[in-house]
Amino acid sequence: MASSPPIYNLEQYGTNCSEEYSNFYENSKYWIQCLWLIPTLFLLVWIIITTRVRYPSQYSNLPYWILTADCVVSIILILLDLFVVRLFLYFPQLCSKFSTIFINYPIISDIYFPIYNYARVFKTGSQCGMILSRLFCVLIPFGHDEKLRRHIPLFLTIICILPILVVWNTVISEKEVVFWYGGFFVIYHRRVGWVSLSKLHLTFIFVSISFILISSLLLMRHLPIESAVNAERRVITNSIFIIVAFFFQAAFQSFYAFFRYTDWYPRFLVDFQFIIYDVMTVGYPLIFLNFAKEFRNHVFLKSNRKGRTLMELRSMSKPFNNTMPRQESPSPNYDSILA
């Protein structure tokens, strides 16, 4: 049986650690990226504490459970970036010692490489789950919390399983240490030759973009008139951010999937792809906080005397006939679902 081709043009990479690159310049890339990764890491931890420790009863609905899962996966992704992937790529002074460890103990790569890619793909599915839960809140305005709460384990299970369909080949495939810019990182050689991580992720992204577009249009179509202006603005802004972030990921995956074997494949894309994925990792919790006033006040320990709590909003919720025209559909609490 013919072996599958490597996913990289290996001639682009060195065979051992290089001392040709400036330690200061390469280290600076790492420290600059730490400027947004480390604050985001602390923010994500605090969001989890807020939703699961400080106010677990108020944030027990589906969107906040999806947010919690997304935060946990983002924390794993950032920790792997800070202490493994970007650290060993941008610190040439660590290359000689730690590349030997990775080569001699391949179990390290076998564990972290699939987890790292799983965490990247996870956000594609979690955003679909988030927009779907919001759509249910509009289509089923009365008692949607209770109905969705019964299915939270099912929703979370599906969201967690979907990325496995994209990254499973990285689990069973051989990993290899390659050298780049004085540092090193890990690649994989596909055991199942036709199953490409980049092409599967690209397909997953396009499906997610289509799903988010359709769901956002349906969401705006069924919003009641009382909350239409502010809620539509939030839906549009949130959807645009997610779609633009996914578009950049799709552009990178497309370029990588079809041109990585060429000699002219730009070397800077290895660095730039980190920024592309950081847009979603760093940006989404900020977007969420920006549009969820109640939640933002809880996260930043602000007084909420002038606002209504989530429990108050739920108690004021009124049913309406979703077959009625949009302008005749009364409901007082819809901007709470667009958190």
Swiss-Prot record:
It comes from the Eukaryota. The chain crosses the membrane at residues 30-50, 65-85, 98-118, 152-172, 200-220, 239-259, 268-288. One of its GO terms (cellular component) is membrane. It is found in: Membrane. Pfam families: Srg. It is a multi-pass membrane protein. Its main location: membrane. Residues 319-339 are annotated as: Disordered. GO terms for biological process: sensory perception of chemical stimulus. InterPro entries: 7TM_GPCR_serpentine_rcpt_Srg (IPR000609), Nematode_SR-like (IPR051119). Keywords: Membrane, Transmembrane, Transmembrane helix. GO terms for molecular function: transmembrane signaling receptor activity. Belongs to the nematode receptor-like protein srg family. This is Serpentine receptor class gamma-7.
